[in-house]
Amino acid sequence: MRRAGAACSAMDRLRLLLLLILGVSSGGAKETCSTGLYTHSGECCKACNLGEGVAQPCGANQTVCEPCLDNVTFSDVVSATEPCKPCTECLGLQSMSAPCVEADDAVCRCAYGYYQDEETGHCEACSVCEVGSGLVFSCQDKQNTVCEECPEGTYSDEANHVDPCLPCTVCEDTERQLRECTPWADAECEEIPGRWIPRSTPPEGSDSTAPSTQEPEVPPEQDLVPSTVADMVTTVMGSSQPVVTRGTTDNLIPVYCSILAAVVVGLVAYIAFKRWNSCKQNKQGANSRPVNQTPPPEGEKLHSDSGISVDSQSLHDQQTHTQTASGQALKGDGNLYSSLPLTKREEVEKLLNGDTWRHLAGELGYQPEHIDSFTHEACPVRALLASWGAQDSATLDALLAALRRIQRADIVESLCSESTATSPV
């Protein structure tokens, strides 16, 4: 009996030990479930990856995931319960700096010249540094413009939100200062007329036969011809007056100038003589022809003994064409926007990113309903500029003024630098 009881007790202990082992293994399996959720059958619910949302949560069945739609929905977490979330829309004065993709939401930022107020979340216009103050921190994202009063030695003569205080101009040794530098205006310098450099003065009472210590002042309107060879100052024996001899280059300059002048005068006289002789022959030929005979063309060539042929009519037409072309190049098409090169207009379209073109349209006189109609076009900026460019008042000056009013000085500088680079001299 005792042996049977002992055997039963051992069996009970073995069963209890097996139950404990199974319980521990079952609890450990549940602890390794990353989601902490289980199906009705005890299976760990799986999580949806980044870019996927839960279409059907687990319960009777396992979790069902679906991919998020680009530019429509996104999911930036790994979850067994979160569905795809709708993308954020950039509205009003906001522009998109990063698009909405499957795993990341869109990132919006305020348009150029605006920043996001942290308290209201709205886009506010950047503060302008007044005259006498300069930029310390630029206006961007959630940071408004930070200005400072220009310290000594710097100035700012323009109110904007992009330029810091500039260092004052320091006049050179050959200049004199007309106006001091102030926090709101730069210093103004003027060239001093050229003078001879004074030499050291010998002590009084000395018997030195050196020349005068101060060279005479040369009037500013007279040009001084620099010498490449140093002036040599000698003293004639028995005389206190110095003898100044110039270098060889100074002696040759008048000779070269005389030869050049003689060549120019001779060439002008030769051309004048040939023209006078040609006119005389033309008059004699015209008198010998009948009255009803057609006069000779103005383009008749004039031959000289040297073999040089001059076509007076061609020269006249060429000069007239050159003057006309120069006048048109200087005058342009009345500075119309449509006269800009295609590449320059495309550059303006690229710079008008985000919703900046809406503000430009308002400055150009378009109503809100007309501005909204441009959004239906494939490229609203190009449609706006094409519509405005067709008007008679669509001048480049009007466009530059509108760009300055919306604080787009970068586009103004681009247009002005291009116009300067291509303008005729």
Curated annotation (Swiss-Prot):
PTM notes = Subject to intramembrane proteolytic cleavage by the gamma-secretase complex, giving rise to an intracellular fragment that is rapidly degraded via the proteasome. N- and O-glycosylated.
Look up what happens after changing residue 257 to A.
Alters mode of dimerization, but does not abolish dimerization
Q: InterPro entries of this UniProt entry?
A: DEATH-like_dom_sf (IPR011029), Death_dom (IPR000488), Neurotrophin_rcpt-DD (IPR052302), TNFR/NGFR_Cys_rich_reg (IPR001368), TNFR16_TM (IPR041448), TNFR_16 (IPR022325), TNFRSF16_N (IPR034046)
Cystine bridges: which residues? 33-44, 45-58, 48-65, 68-84, 87-100, 90-108, 110-123, 126-139, 129-147, 150-165, 168-181, 171-189
UniProt entry keywords in alphabetical sequence:
Apoptosis, Biological rhythms, Cell membrane, Cell projection, Cytoplasm, Developmental protein, Differentiation, Disulfide bond, Glycoprotein, Membrane, Neurogenesis, Phosphoprotein, Receptor, Repeat, Signal, Synapse, Transmembrane, Transmembrane helix
Q: Where in the cell is it found?
A: Cell membrane; Cytoplasm; Perikaryon; Cell projection, Growth cone
Role summary:
Low affinity receptor which can bind to NGF, BDNF, NTF3, and NTF4. Forms a heterodimeric receptor with SORCS2 that binds the precursor forms of NGF, BDNF and NTF3 with high affinity, and has much lower affinity for mature NGF and BDNF. In response to proNGF binding, the heterodimeric receptor with SORCS2 activates a signaling cascade that leads to decreased Rac activity, reorganization of the actin cytoskeleton and neuronal growth cone collapse. Plays an important role in differentiation and survival of specific neuronal populations during development.
- Sequence ranges on the Extracellular membrane side: 30-253
Q: What gene is behind this protein? A: Ngfr
Protein name, please? Tumor necrosis factor receptor superfamily member 16
* Biological processes, Gene Ontology terms: axon guidance; cellular response to amyloid-beta; cellular response to oxidative stress; central nervous system development; circadian regulation of gene expression; circadian rhythm; detection of temperature stimulus; dorsal aorta development
- What organism is recorded for this protein? Rattus norvegicus (Rat)
Which regions of this chain are Cytoplasmic-facing, per the record's topological domains?
A: 275-425
Entry's Pfam families?
Death, TNFR_16_TM, TNFR_c6
